[in-house]
Amino acid sequence: MEDRPSADEVLLIGTVVDAFGLHGEIKVRSVTDRVDHLRHHVQTVFVGEERRPFPLQRIREPKTGVLILTLGGVTDRTMAEALRGAEVTIRECDAAPLEADEYFIHQLYGLRVVESSGAEIGIVREVLQTGANDVIVVERHGRSDTLLPMIHDVVESLDVAAGQIVVRLLPGLIDEEG
């Protein structure tokens, strides 16, 4: 049996929304756009808070955002229904390689946000996925939080290893009063 990874070693690929059919398949609301990578490079997924390992036998994507997974050991509808609501994760090391301008959402939490001048703005407290682009919620010491879009016009550099995001503030982007 495969070792269960810790919470900081996994990436979310989706949440089980229901059983699918009679033979134990599960329907997953997906948060990944790398289905081909999953299909060809991932052999094990982890399900639920306890990150129980299951062999990934088959994966289909009937429509964008929906996956149908066949997991080893889940052989009937009752077993599949028992997984409803559980998160499905993979080991981070099994994830598709990132492009130069890509990041994993969880990597942004806690990063320092600084202006290109070096002035500190705050710390990333939350990441909102809007569809068009991600937006970071920056907690500013002694001031109200501010929202910054993760777009090329604003983000000059993102260095996870250094723990910071350097931004170029466009006029009106930050409320200096709050």
Curated annotation (Swiss-Prot):
Matching InterPro entries: PRC_barrel-like_sf, PRC_RimM, RimM, RimM_N, RimM_N_sf, Transl_B-barrel_sf
Keyword terms: Chaperone, Cytoplasm, Ribosome biogenesis, rRNA processing
Name assigned to this protein: Ribosome maturation factor RimM
Family to which this protein belongs: Belongs to the RimM family.
Record remark on domains: The PRC barrel domain binds ribosomal protein uS19.
Domain of life: Bacteria
Principal location listed in the UniProt entry: cytoplasm
Name of encoding gene: rimM
Every PRC barrel domain range: 100-173
Any one GO BP annotation for this protein: rRNA processing
GO cellular component: cytoplasm; ribosome
NCBIfam families per UniProt: 16S_RimM
Self-association state and partner proteins as the record states: Binds ribosomal protein uS19.
Function text: An accessory protein needed during the final step in the assembly of 30S ribosomal subunit, possibly for assembly of the head region. Essential for efficient processing of 16S rRNA. May be needed both before and after RbfA during the maturation of 16S rRNA. It has affinity for free ribosomal 30S subunits but not for 70S ribosomes.
Gene Ontology molecular function terms on file: ribosome binding
Gene3D superfamilies xref list: PRC-barrel domain, RimM
Localisation per UniProt entry: Cytoplasm
